[in-house]
C-alpha cells in the first residue's frame, strides 16, 4: 500500500475510533480479537470435539435434543465449571422446572446462582438483555426457547392462532442481544426442543422451535441424544449420551463426543478419562488390567473409575495430559471419509480387471 493510502486509512481509523469508541474497528490479526475464552462443558471428549476446550465466551450457543436427553444436565455442568473459575451465572427458567437439589448434586453452587422464572417470553428475553448489559454476568442459560411464550398468546384464548409470533420475538431479541453478548464477553446458552415437520418425504422431519433466527445467530449448535442405558443388574442408573457439533464458527464442525451421564451424579468424567486415556495410549490396557506410568491401577474399567474418583491428583494429571495432547493439534488426523479421485479410479480399474 502506498503512503498516501496508508495516511488516508490511518486518518479514517482514527476518526472512527474517535466517533464510535476504541475497539470499534481493528485488524483481525490483533491478539485481543483472535483469542476466544472457553468454558468447559464438564465433558473432556465434548471439549475436544468443540475444538477450543469448551463453549466460547461472547457467543450464542444452542443445545437441542429430544426429551430426557441431558440438555439441562449439560448446561448445569457448564454452570458448575464456570463457578469453579469464579464466574457469575444466571439461569432463566422459562419451563419452571429447575430442581435445585439435582443442580447441587451436579456441583452447582445454588446459593450463588441467579435464577429467574419469568411469566412471558418478552419478560425472559428482557431480563436476559439486562443481565448481559450489566457486564457482571458471565454465563446465562435460557431453558427453553419452546417455553418463551409471547404475551399475546398468554393473554389470548386457548384456541387462538398466533402464526409466527414466537419466531418474530426470537428474531427481534437476538438482533439486540448479539452485539451486547460480544461486548460483555458473556456465554449465552439457549436450550431448545425438537418438533416434527408434517409431510416431509425426504430428509429429516425434525426441526427446532422458535423459527430460524437462532440457527443463524448461534456460533455453536449441539445436538444431544440418548443412545443407550447404563444398567447395574436390572436397574437403569444412567444414560449413554452422544453429542454432535452440528454448527461451529470457532473450530471445525461435525465432530462427535460420547459420554455417560449417571442419574444424580452427572457426566462421568472418570469414565471419559479411562476411555480417552486408553485410546491415546496414556493408559495401557492388557486384558482386563489397566496400567498408568508402568504401574497397574486396576482390573476392569469400574475399578479404575473408582480409583480416579478417590485419587483426584492422578485424575487431574491424566486430564491435564489429555487436554494438552488433544487440544494442541498434535493428534494424527484420521483418514477422511471422502476418498481421493486417484484412489476411486484405481478401485474402479481393479473391479473391471
From Swiss-Prot:
GO molecular function: ATP binding; ATP hydrolysis activity; ATP-dependent DNA damage sensor activity; damaged DNA binding; single-stranded DNA binding
Location within or outside the cell: Cytoplasm
Major localization class: cytoplasm
SUPFAM superfamilies reported for this sequence: P-loop containing nucleoside triphosphate hydrolases (SSF52540), RecA protein, C-terminal domain (SSF54752)
ATP-binding is among the record's keywords: yes
Single Gene Ontology BP annotation: DNA repair
GO cellular component terms, A-Z: cytosol
Positions with a binding annotation for ATP: 65-72
Protein keywords: ATP-binding, Cytoplasm, DNA damage, DNA recombination, DNA repair, DNA-binding, Nucleotide-binding, SOS response
Stored Pfam families: RecA, RecA_C
Domain of life: Bacteria
Listed InterPro entries: AAA+_ATPase, DNA_recomb/repair_RecA, DNA_recomb/repair_RecA_CS, P-loop_NTPase, RecA-like_C, RecA-like_N, RecA_ATP-bd, RecA_C_sf
Free-text function comment from the UniProt entry: Can catalyze the hydrolysis of ATP in the presence of single-stranded DNA, the ATP-dependent uptake of single-stranded DNA by duplex DNA, and the ATP-dependent hybridization of homologous single-stranded DNAs. It interacts with LexA causing its activation and leading to its autocatalytic cleavage.
Family indicated by similarity: Belongs to the RecA family.
Protein name: Protein RecA
Organism for this UniProt entry: Aeromonas salmonicida (strain A449)
Phylogenetic lineage: Bacteria, Pseudomonadati, Pseudomonadota, Gammaproteobacteria, Aeromonadales
Gene designation per UniProt: recA
Amino acid at each position: 500500500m502506498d503512503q498516501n493510502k496508508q495516511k488516508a486509512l490511518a486518518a479514517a481509523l482514527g476518526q472512527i475510533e474517535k466517533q464510535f469508541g476504541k475497539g470499534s474497528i481493528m485488524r483481525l490479526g490483533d491478539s485481543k480479537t483472535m483469542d476466544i475464552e472457553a468454558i468447559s462443558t464438564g465433558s473432556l471428549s465434548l471439549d475436544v470435539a468443540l475444538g477450543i476446550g469448551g463453549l466460547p465466551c461472547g457467543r450464542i450457543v444452542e443445545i437441542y435434543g429430544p426429551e430426557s436427553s441431558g440438555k439441562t444436565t449439560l448446561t448445569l455442568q457448564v454452570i458448575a465449571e464456570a463457578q469453579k473459575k469464579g464466574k457469575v451465572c444466571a439461569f432463566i427458567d422459562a419451563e419452571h422446572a429447575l430442581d435445585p437439589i439435582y443442580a447441587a448434586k451436579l456441583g452447582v453452587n445454588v446459593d450463588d446462582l441467579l435464577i429467574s422464572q419469568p411469566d412471558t417470553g418478552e419478560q425472559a428475553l428482557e431480563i436476559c438483555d439486562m443481565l448481559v448489559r450489566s457486564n457482571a454476568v458471565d454465563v446465562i442459560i435460557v431453558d427453553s426457547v419452546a417455553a418463551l411464550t409471547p404475551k399475546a398468546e398468554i393473554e389470548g384464548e386457548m384456541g387462538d392462532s398466533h402464526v409466527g409470533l414466537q419466531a418474530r420475538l426470537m428474531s427481534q431479541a437476538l438482533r439486540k442481544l448479539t452485539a451486547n453478548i460480544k461486548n460483555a464477553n458473556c456465554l449465552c446458552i439457549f436450550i431448545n426442543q425438537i418438533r416434527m415437520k408434517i409431510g416431509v418425504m425426504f430428509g429429516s422431519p425434525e426441526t427446532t422451535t422458535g423459527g430460524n433466527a437462532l440457527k443463524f445467530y448461534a456460533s455453536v449448535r449441539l445436538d444431544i441424544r440418548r443412545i443407550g442405558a447404563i444398567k447395574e443388574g436390572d436397574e437403569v442408573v444412567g444414560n449413554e449420551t452422544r453429542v454432535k457439533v452440528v454448527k461451529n464458527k470457532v473450530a471445525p464442525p461435525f465432530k462427535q463426543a460420547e459420554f455417560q451421564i449417571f442419574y444424580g451424579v452427572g457426566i462421568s468424567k472418570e469414565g471419559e478419562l479411562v476411555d480417552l486415556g486408553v485410546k491415546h495410549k496414556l493408559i495401557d490396557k492388557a486384558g482386563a488390567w489397566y496400567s498408568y506410568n508402568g504401574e497397574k491401577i486396576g482390573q476392569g474399567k469400574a475399578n479404575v473409575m473408582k480409583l480416579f474418583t478417590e485419587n483426584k491428583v492422578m485424575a487431574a494429571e491424566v486430564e491435564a495430559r489429555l487436554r494438552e495432547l488433544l487440544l494442541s493439534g498434535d493428534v494424527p488426523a484420521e483418514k477422511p471419509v471422502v476418498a481421493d479421485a486417484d484412489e476411486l479410479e484405481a478401485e474402479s480399474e481393479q473391479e473391471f480387471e
